Amino acid sequence: MSWFTPELIEILISVLKAVVILLVVVTCGAFMSFGERRLLGLFQNRYGPNRVGWGGSLQLVADMIKMFFKEDWVPRFSDRAIFTLAPVIAFTSLLLSFAIVPVSPTWAVADLNIGILFFLMMAGLAVYAVLFAGWASNNKYSLLGAMRASAQTLSYEVFLGLSLMGVVAQAGSFNMQDIVNSQEHVWNVIPQFFGFLTFAIAGVAVCHRHPFDQPEAEQELADGYHIEYSGMKFGLFFVGEYIGIVTVSALIVTLFFGGWQGPFLPPFIWFALKTAFFMVMFILIRASLPRPRYDQVMSFGWKVCLPLTLLNLLATAAVILYNAQ
């Protein structure tokens, strides 16, 4: 009797696909830290890191070695268990969100019928990492950063979900593969342009990226919620932020730009090229926009983005009802 039954082989292949996809995402998130510094140098007419390896290509390895050998210090006045749990949540929450993204017609970690709801759930879970880090550090700057993060995430996740409801209504499904297949003739970015705009803005805010990096504003909060972190714990926060950028870029491509669809090239290549474009856009936004005040960030979310999202949803519903007659 052979142990390798067809069912077991199918399970092993699925596990192998999941491991490969998630390892590629983690690797892209790590290398994006080097790519961001080089691109920021290009945008600002300077060199960026260029000393370690050819053209600075080994800078990431040097940073990893440095973080690995730094003291893993835990403040005596902190809550050790929650202090340690926070970076793990920050690293895994948005990484697991990538599980629903189909990178080709046959490659996806999980083909869920509630794919979009799963992403919204994991995005909501990510804020707990910031709250835990701010509270467990027992530091006033960390706590202020955590409070900012909770208010900002509460505000922007409202229209993060609403911006996707137009896409769901057009596709008739929460499944990511169904949404990609529904864009065979026209990408969702055309009928759902305002939904795309608000989702992209909310995605930047959920990743706590500039100009929505209020929870870790260096000039105001001395690096905010991870001021007490060092070594690999800080590294998990650091890489987790870039994994969030990769995940949000991949979701923008999947939901609004046809996912892996495209002529001539293999589906995975199309998906990678589209995702890389939006990852570069994240860096360009950081290089070109100033950081607004915290009250301006909140006002922009509630007074501009939320009404725009509701109008887009109402217009989409009206068009669908008109076409159904």
Swiss-Prot record:
The keyword Cell membrane applies. GO terms for molecular function: oxidoreductase activity, acting on NAD(P)H, quinone or similar compound as acceptor; quinone binding. It is a multi-pass membrane protein. It holds the Pfam family NADHdh. GO terms for biological process: aerobic respiration. It catalyses: a quinone + NADH + 5 H(+)(in) = a quinol + NAD(+) + 4 H(+)(out). Its main location: membrane. InterPro entries: NADH_UbQ_OxRdtase_su1/FPO, NADH_UbQ_OxRdtase_su1_CS. Keywords: Cell inner membrane, Cell membrane, Membrane, NAD, Quinone, Translocase, Transmembrane, Transmembrane helix, Ubiquinone. The chain crosses the membrane at residues 11-31, 81-101, 114-134, 154-174, 186-206, 237-257, 265-285, 304-324. Its EC number is 7.1.1.-. It comes from the Bacteria. One of its GO terms (cellular component) is plasma membrane. Signal peptide: none annotated. It is found in: Cell inner membrane. PROSITE patterns: COMPLEX1_ND1_1, COMPLEX1_ND1_2. Belongs to the complex I subunit 1 family. NDH-1 is composed of 13 different subunits. Subunits NuoA, H, J, K, L, M, N constitute the membrane sector of the complex. NDH-1 shuttles electrons from NADH, via FMN and iron-sulfur (Fe-S) centers, to quinones in the respiratory chain. The immediate electron acceptor for the enzyme in this species is believed to be ubiquinone. Couples the redox reaction to proton translocation (for every two electrons transferred, four hydrogen ions are translocated across the cytoplasmic membrane), and thus conserves the redox energy in a proton gradient. This subunit may bind ubiquinone. This is NADH-quinone oxidoreductase subunit H. The lineage of its organism: Bacteria, Pseudomonadati, Pseudomonadota, Gammaproteobacteria, Enterobacterales.
